[in-house]
Curated annotation (Swiss-Prot):
Activity regulation text: Activated by a myriad of ligands such as acetylcholine, cytisine, nicotine, choline and epibatidine. The heteropentamer CHRNA3:CHRNB4 activity is blocked by the alpha-conotoxin ImI and AuIB.
Residues with site note (Key residue for a low dissociation (K(off)) from the conotoxin BuIA): I133, Q141
Lineage of producing organism: Eukaryota, Metazoa, Chordata, Craniata, Vertebrata
Membrane-spanning segments: 236-256, 265-285, 298-318, 464-484
Quaternary structure and partners: Neuronal AChR is composed of two different types of subunits: alpha and beta. CHRNB4/Beta-4 subunit can be combined to CHRNA2/alpha-2, CHRNA3/alpha-3 or CHRNA4/alpha-4, CHRNA5/alpha-5 and CHRNB3/beta-3 to give rise to functional receptors. Forms stoichiometries such as (CHRNA3)2:(CHRNB4)3 or (CHRNA3:CHRNB4)2:CHRNB3. Interacts with RIC3; which is required for proper folding and assembly. Interacts with LYPD6.
GO molecular function list: acetylcholine receptor activity; acetylcholine-gated monoatomic cation-selective channel activity; transmitter-gated monoatomic ion channel activity involved in regulation of postsynaptic membrane potential
Tissue specificity note: Predominantly expressed by immature T-cells in the thymus.
The protein, known as: Neuronal acetylcholine receptor subunit beta-4
Main location: membrane
Pfam families from the UniProt entry: Neur_chan_LBD, Neur_chan_memb
């Protein structure tokens, strides 16, 4: 009767599944390994004080979360795989029912306290202490996930076609090179589980082991994150609007001077470019070491628009000149009225002036003189006077002599002489009045011709500056944006 309970317990143990026995074996193994009498997680796992513990590191990139250009911080989600050997955690698997792998909480074993040295938020260690994987030969593998914010020096020279080299520097916080040795398990970071970024392309992720020649006890492992920006976002939202706004400045030279809106268009374009320049200053870091590429382009276009404002003032000044204020020099006529229009593909419409529109003043003077000389040579009838002068005053043919003679034949001689004298005097005064009007019209024609010449000079200057602006704008844009597109960035070499 006394052996019955013991027999029942033995039968119950035999009927249990194998995993329960295995769980009991793992529990017993953990109790044996982590017994406080034989294991202290604060002591380095070395058989002697001079023994060097080798820590093998391997970084696996999960996600490039963001790169804050203004604060110069890179945020990444990584897994930092660490491997080392702890002889105190080795066991004979045959004594524990073939258990070869044991998972132990990380805080219960010795850790090499490897931290991110160049962190930017004060978080040096990992955020989650996952279990370590311990094998029967004493090798330990720890793969903790972490979200790191690391300091990254942003090079703004080619923004937004830039390529950055941000680093993650890992080092033990309390142990130096005489106690632990950090080595790379692979020359580059692992990207098997990487989630692509919408803003950056990963160019390369080389790792290097750095030893300070001045301090042999210093050693660290550094991973270079060589990333290249995807410029589509900034091209659509910054570069193309800037180019379109700059192209509006070209219309300033094509706009007629008489419309009065040339200066308004120039100032509007300049204000728009100033707004974009202020927008850029909110994105890039406030550094004085270099000027971003988009900033250089905006400054370049602002200089061009300022130049267009100056040229517009000059063109308007030339356009509104007149003979009463300025005299056109001969070289100006030769250069801007004859030579430059040919090279600028400009053709001035010809001025068609009808010769019968108004008699020339010299002809009127000649007619008056002839009329006076005729009266001085001898008495003449009004018919002779008509025949000599009416052709110039009135296009209607003069009255024939026979009609005039028959009209005056019945008058006395003295009356005829007095009548012809008064008629000659009235006719002379009329001719002098017509001569004055002709001279005035001729003077107005000359002044108007000079004014039209000044306006054409202004058009030539406007067209000249138009070609200069277009050529400089195209060459400047290509010179600024083409080199960064074809530039090859070499990754940093380790020491």
């Amino acid at each position: 009767m006394r052996g019955t309970p013991l027999l029942l317990v033995s039968l119950f143990a035999l009927l249990q599944p194998g995993d329960c026995r295995l769980a009991n074996a793992e529990e017993k193994l953990m109790d044996d390994l982590l017994n406080k009498t034989r294991y202290n997680n604060l002591i380095r796992p070395a058989t002697s004080s001079s023994q060097l513990i080798s820590i093998r590191l391997e970084l696996s990139l999960s996600q490039l979360i963001s790169v804050n250009e203004r604060e110069q911080i890179m945020t990444t989600s990584i897994w930092l795989k660490q491997e080392w050997t702890d002889y105190r955690l080795a066991w004979n698997s045959s004594c524990y029912e073939g258990v070869n792998i044991l998972r132990i909480p990380a805080k219960r074993v010795w850790l090499p306290d490897i931290v991110l040295y160049n962190n930017a938020d004060g978080t040096y260690e990992v955020s989650v202490y996952t279990n370590v994987i311990v094998r029967s030969n004493g090798s330990i593998q720890w793969l903790p996930p972490a979200i790191y914010k690391s300091a990254c020096k942003i090079e703004v020279k080619h923004f937004p076609f830039d390529q950055q080299n941000c680093t993650l520097k890992f080092r033990s916080w309390t142990y130096d090179h005489t106690e632990i040795d950090m080595v790379l398990k692979s020359p580059t970071a692992i990207m098997d589980d990487f989630t692509p970024s919408g803003e950056w392309d990963i160019v390369a992720l080389p790792g290097r082991r750095t030893v300070n020649p001045q301090d042999p006890s210093y050693v660290d492992v550094t991973y270079d994150f060589i990333i290249k920006r995807k410029p589509l976002f900034y091209t659509i939202n910054l570069i193309i609007p800037c180019v379109l706004i700059t192209s509006l400045a070209i219309l300033v030279f094509y706009l007629p001077s008489d419309c009065g809106e040339k200066m308004t268009l120039c100032i509007s374009v300049l204000l728009a470019l100033t707004f974009f320049l202020l927008l850029i200053s909110k994105i890039v870091p406030p550094t004085s070491l270099d000027i971003p590429l988009i900033g250089k382009y905006l400054l370049f276009t602002m200089v061009l628009v300022t130049f267009s404002i100056v040229t517009t003032v000059c063109v308007l000044n030339v356009h509104h000149r007149s003979p009463s204020t300025h005299t056109m020099a001969s070289w100006v006529k030769e250069c801007f009225l004859h030579k430059l229009p040919t090279f600028l593909f400009m053709k001035r419409p010809g001025l068609e002036v009808s010769p019968a529109r108004v008699p020339h003043s010299s002809q009127l003077h000649l007619t008056t003189a002839e009329a006076t000389s005729t009266s001085a040579l001898g008495p003449s009838s009004p018919s002779n006077l008509y025949g000599n002068s009416m052709y110039f005053v009135n296009p209607v043919p003069a009255t024939p002599k026979s009609a005039v003679s028959s009209h005056t034949a019945g008058l006395p001689r003295d009356a005829r002489l007095r009548s012809s004298g008064r008629f000659r005097q009235d006719l002379q005064e009329a001719l002098e009045g017509v001569s004055f009007i002709a001279q005035h019209l001729e003077s107005d024609d000359r002044d108007q011709s000079v004014i039209e010449d000044w306006k054409f000079v202004a058009m030539v200057v406007d067209r000249l500056f138009l070609w200069v602006f277009v050529i400089v704008c195209i060459l400047g844009t290509m010179g600024l944006f083409l080199p960064p597109l074809f530039q090859i960035h070499a990754p940093s070499k380790g020491l």
